[in-house]
Amino acid sequence: MDASLLLSVALAVVLIPLSLALLNRLRLGRLPPGPRPWPVLGNLRQIKPIRCRCFQEWAERYGPVISVWFGSGLTVVVSTSELAKEVLKENDQQLADRPRNRSTQRFSRNGQDLIWADYGPHYIKVRKLCNLELFTPKRLEALRPIREDEVTAMVESVYRAATAPGNEGKPMVVRNHLSMVAFNNITRLAFGKRFMNANGDIDEQGREFKTIVNNGIKIGASLSVAEFIWYLRWLCPLNEELYKTHNERRDRLTMKIIEEHAKSLKESGAKQHFVDALFTLKQQYDLSEDTVIGLLWDMITAGMDTTVISVEWAMAELVRNPRVQKKLQEELDRVVGRDRVMLETDFQNLPYLQAVVKESLRLHPPTPLMLPHKASTNVKIGGYDIPKGANVMVNVWAVARDPKVWSNPLEYRPERFLEENIDIKGSDFRVLPFGAGRRVCPGAQLGINLVASMIGHLLHHFEWSLPEGTRPEDVNMMESPGLVTFMGTPLQAVAKPRLEKEELYNRVPVEM
């Protein structure tokens, strides 16, 4: 590269951001306050790894609605229930679009799925499909045996680990047992296939499935800082071949499974799995192949890690709070007894279990900043100007810990949800683990049912305690960085069987 070209690049790097900053001051109006951005990088160097905590700290300093600059892109973050209502209800339609970076643009085939689609005819059509066909009470009930099967498989796995010779009283990594049920459940619901046998061995398609998921995560995490600075992207071009290969591999596996189901439809008729529903409804809803594949993988990415995260955080709170654990076990013994396993039909008679689920999701929402919204027009939030094209995030982690709304917000106390009937599926803006408005998670009830079932079974079958010598305050309750927030340190706990009948610890397999 000769000297004149180097000089041109250097001048561009300096002058373009200064010019843009001047133009922004003139056209953007009265923006929310926030930390002073650096030239070119914006606030990227100031953002701490665990963003929900970082943004809460900034909200305490600058106010409940703040401006955060990701390079040259503006993101507005709100941190109170009142402002969440402004974003997700009062300005819902104007803020219903999704920002797509170069990676999500390619993964979603320019928003042909649901999660990354802009609000418009395509989104409305696919959302209608989800609400009227895929996540109906009738379909969720029809698929209940799969969920109950996989939860009993989890119980069997924990029991084997806890009672193996030499393991009595030894801690186990709880997440390992949760991941198995989440993987099997979502693949069976979506594809109608169990890729794992009774011994925990994964077949060839299952290994390919896991490889595709892991590759997608690696590719998405490999984006450079140029992703946030549009005028530098020519210096950091995407590896288009990498995305092309990944998508082709994903599509090839998905289409093979769809073809298998098409064959089974002819032989035995339609079932209730999501792939069967999409195949049956493809013509009625005018679904492209890209949309069918995108919807199936939306369900997988949205439902796998979030379930594990939610249950692991709940178990961490329960081993740190023996009073709550004992109270829940007393309710389970009273309603379910000690001679059978819990069923989802028991939920209506288990209010404390429901309160435990709600309190766990209040303190530890698996997606603490939700997915970003994008302004399709100029709007006002909290009296500030939000320009068209800006991203807007709701810090639901901070909203649910607001001391102005919640008494003793950091205390784990499920009783608060017995004292007041608080909805967690989007109608009460004080607690929003599934979002609200046009972008609320369509599978919220499915997620709640699975989390409640897993927690209920783990507490009904076992007493849980911390490893010897570990105090409640010793458990690391910090989150890991990322869009979804696992526990930074995987929970280790000791499981002691509490039901007398050994057969209650066996998996109850269901073929469907």
From Swiss-Prot:
Q: Where in the cell is it found?
A: Membrane
Organism equals Sorghum bicolor (Sorghum)
The EC number(s) attached to this protein equal 1.14.-.-
Q: Which SUPFAM superfamilies match?
A: Cytochrome P450
Query: Of which family is this protein a member?
Result: Belongs to the cytochrome P450 family.
> What top-tier enzyme class does this entry carry?
oxidoreductase
Q: Which InterPro entries match?
A: Cyt_P450, Cyt_P450_CS, Cyt_P450_E_grp-I, Cyt_P450_sf
Its GO CC terms?
membrane
The membrane-topology field of this record reads: Single-pass membrane protein
Keyword Oxidoreductase set for record: yes
Transmembrane segments annotated in the record for this chain: 3-23
- List required co-factors: heme
Q: Specify the protein name.
A: Cytochrome P450 98A1
Task: Identify the keywords attached in UniProt to this record, alphabetized.
Answer: Heme, Iron, Membrane, Metal-binding, Monooxygenase, Oxidoreductase, Transmembrane, Transmembrane helix
| One MF term in the entry's GO annotations | monooxygenase activity
CDD domains in the record, alphabetically? CYP98
Which residues take part in binding heme?
A: C441
